[in-house]
Each structure stands twice: as C-alpha cells, then as structure tokens.
Curated annotation (Swiss-Prot):
Residues 107-116 have a biased composition (Acidic residues). The gene is GWT1. It is found in: Endoplasmic reticulum membrane. This is GPI-anchored wall transfer protein 1. It comes from the Eukaryota. Pfam families: GWT1. It comes from Cryptococcus neoformans var. grubii serotype A (strain H99 / ATCC 208821 / CBS 10515 / FGSC 9487).
C-alpha cells in the first residue's frame, strides 16, 4: 500500500497544465449540453434517466475521452440542438398562426376606411380592438341602455327616488352588479387577454388565478444562474474522481506551482459561485421588497448588529462546513489515503477555505460604504500580490513545514486570494440580483401587471448582458496585461493573475448561460419558462450543492480505497465514472424539491 500511495502522489504531481484557451474550449461542452437540453426538453419526459443522459453524460465524456478534441464534440452537440430547435419552431409556428375569419376581426391597419393610428410608447400597436355587443358596451361604460326611460337605473326619476334612501349610491352599484350576471363577454379564445375595447377606452379582462399565481411563483427564478452553478458543481464532482484515472488527461489536473488547468479554475469557480449567491446576505437590502428566488437564496445575516456580532453570526453559520473539514481530515489521516500535500498543506483542506472566506467578507463589509465589492477585491488581491512577491512566495515554495503555519502554508497564504475571488463574485451578484427587483414605475394602461413586470425583466436582462460583456472584457484585459508583463498564474498561491483569471472565466461563462436563455427561443409560448430552461436534476444540485459535494467526496474516497484507479484501463475507468456520476445524480434526484442546508 505504501508503494502505491507514493506512486499515486507522484501520478498527480508536477502537472504542467494547459493553455487558457484549451481550458475554455473544454468548458464549452457545458454550454452545449445546456443548449441540447433546451432543444430536446419538449420531446422527452423530464425523468432521472433523461436528465442524466442529456445533462451529465455528455459533460463526463467532454472532460475525459473527448477533451483532446473539445470543439469537435461541442460542434456535434450544437448541430443536434440546432436541428431540434429549428424543427420545434416550425411546428410551433404552424399551430400558433390561426387564419383570421374574414369580415369579423380587423386590425385598424387592415381597414381601408381610416389610416392606422400610430403606435403608442407603451407598445399598444400590438393590441387589437374587439367588437362588443351594445349591452356589453353599455355595461363597460357604467350604464345599461333600456328601452323604457322610466325604468332605467340612470333616469332622473330613479335617481331622485333613491336619493334619500341610498345617499352613497350603494344600491345603484349593487343593481349594476346584479345586471352583470346576465351579461357575457363573448371574446374569441384565440384573442389575447390584453385588448383595447372600442369605443370604451380600456377594459381589463382578468386572467385566471391559476395562471397568474404560477407566473408570480416562477418569475423570481433565474434559470441561467441555476444552471451555471449546477454545471460548476457537476464539473467539480466529475473531476475530483476522474483525476485519479488515466483516462483523465494529466494536463487537466491541478498544477504544482504555476500554470493553468481545468481543475485549477474549478477550485476558484467554487468560491466565485459562493460569493455570487451570498449577495443577499452580505449586501445592503434593496429599497423595495424582492421576490424570493431559489437561485439567489442564501442564509441572511442581519445588518443591524455590530461588526463583531455579525462576524460571530457568520462564524456560527460556518460551523457545519468546518465540521466537514475536520471529518475529512480525520478520514484522510486515519486511512493512509493518498494526498497531495502541496495543494493546501498537511492539515488544511478546501472545506476550511469555504468556511472562513464568508467570515472574512463580513469583517470587511463596513468598507462597502465607500468602496464596491469588486474594488475591494482588486485592492486585496494587489496587496496580497505585493506580499507574495517580496516575502511570502519564497516561504510557500520552501520545503520547511515545522509548526502549524508552515505545515499549512498553502492554505493560510491563499486565503487573501480566495477572499478577493469571493468579493468579486459578490459584485457580480449585485448586478444579477437586479433581475429579481420589481419595477418601480407605473405601468401603462394597455399592460397588465404581469406583462409590465415581464417587460421590465426583459429590459433588465439586456442591461445585465451588456454589463457582463463589459466586465468580461475588463477581466480578460487585466489578465492578458499581467501575463504580457511576465506574470504567471498560480492556484497554489491564489495570486493576482489567478484571481483575474477566475473572475474572467466565470463572468464569461455566466454571460454564456444568460445568452442561451435569451437567444434560443423556447418551443413553448413562454420563452423564459423555468420548467423548460432548468433541468430538474440541475435544479436539485443547485439547491443542495454542499450535500452533493459531500456525497461526491465520500464516494471518491470509497472508490480510491477499493481499487487502484491509476492502473485501470479506459473501459473500466469510464464504467466506474458513469456509475459514480449516476449515483450522484440519484442522490440529487432524491433531494429534488428539498433544500439541505449544511
């Protein structure tokens, strides 16, 4: 066992890494699998097996046997997606374009008697007039015509007779309500509910309560954010076991000192994603109430306590993750498990980093009165880089490990870098959170509340697209300038170029998921329906990320103590990885509809 342990540690050591562009090419498979889900979801049942075959299995093949030709594999998946999307749109157009009955329902622009009215600023050009019966017009205007003026509710005699008995006009209102029971608004079923009645200026036709309630429930969800976080988790889960097999390319494993690889950016992406969804708990509350969003849900820390009290509250919430870190430490040391000491140190592991970074962010939160999260992240990263350059880097790369600090020098020295990544994730989360804010201006008369909020969401989505484009270009420019000046990326140090790389990578791919939900039309009547855009399996993984991550770590350890993974042939390696990912998918499916908070 000792010889195998040494061979295994050498197997995962001294990795030279790969180019950033090859890592981006491999990561494009995730976007291609998401596009494939959007294309195929109308034709399949959304069960566990289909979720696994579409969302998980292509990603597993993309980071293993197809990682040497990622663009070919991505193109193959994209062609399939494009074919099904094109077919869906043709079918949808053929069934959603009924022919207009001649002589009954004419738009103003169809008539040759009067020129069409110009469209209003509210977009009322898309609204069609509806022909009503005389009784319907009279009721909509507040009165009902009667052939006998003496019995008319609005006649002088009737008004004077009821003036003393009903000075507030309550009986008149009740009388008109009773007349409503015999009136039916016969509007054709293919006419939308937002209509402009002629000659009455506006008549609001209420939608069914079920439809409205369903829209209100789903409108706060952000599908692109859910899928982005779930794919980040899924790629991490795949890589932590696949790296132990020879079928996983060595250049995708973690680099020793300097270099870039898929697993290097995956570690930082985990911290970036944690910051992205911690926006609600660490940022000041918005001026208006926000709808609950499962994609942005996080435990909330009250803003009223003192900074010291807030730190204690955050530390208390991090205790479960710290416990997981100590459990992993005991299991690794107690089972003589092969470990790579230069990743985090002798005793440190990634759970400790995840637990401490939010606590440190709470400690510096008072500075956000003067500086943005992103500015704080850049400042901390630059100061950390100065400290590394002139003092700390030589200590980290030395062989001495006497004392608790030197034994875990990688874990302690990389904390400022991961804190910077977390703060930049918080900054991006501030922009994403605006999509969940309700509109503040009054809606126009031709829009229902739901339509107004939906149009507001679409405008905010376009704004977010432009913001993410700007941030992506900015982070890539910073990274390119640093590398051009001779800087090197180091995950082990979490130095400034590593921070810029993680920020650029995650901002770009978050933009990619957002563009897919915006550009690819859904084959249903609602382009942004979360039931179509969010695979149920990925939704469950997003809601129970830490539980999934813990299960993956336990299964990884079980596989490694059960077989000599580095000597397994390709067919056996892929079989074990498929069984492993299917088991993780089953765990996520069991947790579907729940939220396990650790």
């Amino acid at each position: 066992m000792g010889d195998y342990k040494s061979a295994k540690e050498a197997f995962v050591s001294d990795n030279p890494g790969a180019s950033i562009w090859s890592i981006n090419a491999v990561s494009l498979v995730a976007l291609a699998t998401y596009a494939l889900w959007i294309a195929l979801s109308p034709y399949i049942r959304h069960g566990l097996l289909n979720n696994y075959l579409i969302c998980v299995l292509p990603l597993l093949f993309g980071v293993t046997i197809f990682s040497t030709s990622p663009l070919v594999f991505t193109s193959f998946l994209s062609i399939i997606s494009l074919a099904f999307i094109t077919k869906s749109q043709k079918c949808f157009k053929s069934v959603s374009s009924p022919e207009k009955p001649k002589g009954q329902w004419l738009d103003e622009s169809d008539s040759d008697e009067e020129p069409a009215e110009p469209a209003s600023a509210a977009g009322s050009a898309a609204v069609s007039p509806v022909k009503l019966l005389p009784s319907q017009v009279a009721f909509a205007s507040g009165s009902l015509l009667s052939p006998d003026p003496t019995t008319s509710p609005m006649s002088p005699s009737s008004s004077s007779a009821s003036g003393h008995e009903d000075p507030l006009g309550i009986m008149g209102v009740n009388r008109r309500r009773s007349l409503l029971e015999g009136v039916s608004l016969d509007v054709p079923s293919h006419i939308d509910s937002k209509v402009r009645i002629s000659p009455v200026p506006y008549l609001r036709l209420k939608k069914s309560r079920a439809t409205k309630a369903q829209w209100v429930k789903e409108k706060g969800r952000l599908p692109f954010l859910t899928v982005y976080r779930a794919h980040m988790m899924l790629m991490t889960v795949i890589c932590i076991l696949a790296v132990d097999f020879e079928v996983f390319p060595r250049w995708q494993g973690k680099c020793e000192d300097f270099g870039t690889s898929l697993m290097d950016v995956g570690v930082g992406s985990f911290v970036f994603s944690l910051g992205l969804v911690s926006t609600k708990s660490l940022s000041p509350p918005p001026p208006t109430p926000t709808p609950s969003s499962p994609a942005l849900n996080s435990h909330i820390i009250p803003l009223t306590p003192s900074p010291f009290t807030s730190i204690l509250i955050s530390l208390r919430k991090s205790i479960p993750i710290l416990v997981l870190g100590f459990i992993r430490l005991i299991m690794v040391k107690g089972s003589d498990y092969p470990e790579h000491v230069t990743e985090y140190g002798v005793h440190w592991n990634f759970f400790f980093t995840l637990a401490l970074v939010p606590v440190l962010a709470v400690g510096i939160r008072p500075l956000t009165q003067w500086l943005r999260w992103s500015v704080l992240g850049v400042i901390i990263s630059l100061l950390h880089q100065l400290w590394l350059t002139y003092y700390l880097q030589s200590i980290v790369f030395s062989f001495g490990r006497s004392g608790i600090f030197l034994a875990n020098k990688e874990g302690f020295s990389s904390l400022p870098g991961y804190l910077s990544i977390f703060l930049i994730g918080l900054s991006i989360g501030d922009h994403v959170l605006r999509l969940s804010l309700p509109p503040r201006r009054e809606r126009v008369v031709s829009e229902t509340n739901e339509e107004h909020e939906q149009s507001h969401f679409e405008r905010k989505k376009l704004d977010l697209i432009m913001e993410l484009i700007g941030y992506s270009l900015g982070w890539w420019a910073l990274l390119g300038g640093w590398i051009w000046a001779g800087g090197e990326v180091s995950r082990r140090l979490a130095n400034a170029p590593y921070v810029f790389w993680v920020a650029a990578y995650n901002t770009t791919f978050l933009l990619g998921y957002l563009l897919l939900t915006h550009i690819i039309p859904s084959p249903t009547s609602s382009q942004t329906s979360p039931s179509i855009l969010v695979p149920p399996l990925l939704d469950a993984m997003n809601k129970n990320g830490l539980a999934i991550f813990l299960a993956a770590n336990l299964l990884t350890g079980l596989v490694n103590v059960s077989m000599k993974t580095m000597y397994a042939p390709a067919w056996l390696s892929m079989g074990v990885l498929m069984l492993y990912t299917l088991t993780i998918s089953c765990v996520g499916w069991i947790l579907k509809g729940r939220r396990i908070k650790i």
